[in-house]
Amino acid sequence: MKVAVATRDVNGNPCIVGIRYLPPAAETKAPVNELAERAVRQLERYREDPDTKFDLPLLIEGTDFQRRVWEIMCAIPRGRTLTYGEVARKMGEGASDAARVVGQACGDNKLPIVIPCHRVVGADGVGGFSHTTDGYLIEVKRWLLMHEARADAFELRP
């Protein structure tokens, strides 16, 4: 998986503001600064070990609703999933379109993997990823889910 990492200085402190998956054929560039390089190293470690803990300074920008969705996503254990509707119910949202709005908040997440939006799925399938429901990004989501599920299955063996 190829990624692009965006950083920004906030009051003199560098922060990660975005992580984006790139198409397989995309050319990659060297990280633009030390923080981006650190982020890429941690993402590469995650690829080898889904237990990797990220210790990156993040700038998380979003509405109060989005932040609540993202907090719930961060509480989903590795190897587990919740549906968009389950996340909505955890938030106390009962409107008929609540699952769709949760899906929008998942798609608006600019820090995938670090804020694990891939752990939120549709009631009848994998759902979307980064505002798309097909193509290489859905393959990335499937890979992330399988990567984490395999790690759990391996750990549960006697």
Please place each PLM-identified region on the residue numbering.
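Nucleic acid-binding interface residues in structured DNA/RNA-binding domains
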Residues: 50-158
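Residues in well-ordered beta-strands of folded domains
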Residues: 4, 20, 145
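Short acidic/polar mixed-charge low-complexity motifs
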Residues: 1-2, 13, 111
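Short beta-strand scaffold segments in enzyme catalytic cores
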Residues: 2-5, 119-120
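Intrinsic disorder/low-complexity segments
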Residues: 5-7, 37, 152-154
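Compact structured core domains
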Residues: 9-55
